[in-house]
Amino acid sequence: MTRSHNHSATLTTPDFDQARAEAAVRELLIAVGEDPDREGLLDTPARVARSYREIFAGLYTDPDEVLTTMFDEQHDEMVLVKDIPMYSTCEHHLVSFHGVAHVGYIPGVDGRVTGLSKLARVVDLYAKRPQVQERLTSQIADALMRKLDPRGAIVVIEAEHLCMAMRGIRKPGAVTTTSAVRGQFKTDKASRAEALDLILRK
């Protein structure tokens, strides 16, 4: 099987190795001084492996495939979906970062739009893999530009990182905000300001 080192790519085929993941979790329990054979931990390796398969499910689906459905609505104004719940995993510590994503675009000259649920699905697929927030934000925006051919795209993610909250600097409640702007949102200050006003308005 071929793997790509391009972070925007996906694996060619699903290849989650349940047995190997279980063995790794068992070894980790031993490494921290636990007894993986005690009652409370007997099924933990299998449970953790199954949860990782779900948490990293985005590795096995190409997000571009989600954006193939288009509708001819002759719409030429911004489409924005706010407050999409988002859960991802910090690739540096393999703990969660979670928050909300705001995703918007201005349809291209053909006025075609995609389904609103597709925007949320793209967020999920890029989030469900080892990530950093900056790359996640850019990947979503780039996917919109690549597949929808819009005049512009904007993505803002606000998230709390448990690697900052529960370890290290230990600052629970700190929120990291990242943005990616493309096309008209990057070149036209008025369009960008309108989008950010809508995103920040509660």
Swiss-Prot record:
Q: Name one GO cellular component term.
A: cytoplasm
Q: Which UniProt keywords apply?
A: GTP-binding, Hydrolase, Metal-binding, Nucleotide-binding, One-carbon metabolism, Zinc
Question: Which superkingdom does the taxonomy of this entry point to?
Answer: Bacteria
Q: What is its EC number?
A: 3.5.4.16
Question: What is the protein named?
Answer: GTP cyclohydrolase 1
The coding gene here is folE
Family per UniProt? Belongs to the GTP cyclohydrolase I family.
The GO biological-process annotations, alphabetized, read as: one-carbon metabolic process; tetrahydrobiopterin biosynthetic process; tetrahydrofolate biosynthetic process
Uppermost EC category: hydrolase
Which residues take part in binding Zn(2+)?
A: C90, H93, C163
Alphabetically, the GO molecular function entries are: GTP binding; GTP cyclohydrolase I activity; zinc ion binding
One of this protein's Pfam families, by short name? GTP_cyclohydroI
Does the keyword section mention Protease? Answer: no
Catalytic activities: GTP + H2O = 7,8-dihydroneopterin 3'-triphosphate + formate + H(+)
| Database matches in NCBIfam families | folE, PRK09347.1-2, PRK09347.1-3
PANTHER family per record: GTP CYCLOHYDROLASE 1, GTP CYCLOHYDROLASE I
Q: How does it assemble?
A: Homomer.
According to UniProt, this protein's pathway is: Cofactor biosynthesis; 7,8-dihydroneopterin triphosphate biosynthesis; 7,8-dihydroneopterin triphosphate from GTP: step 1/1
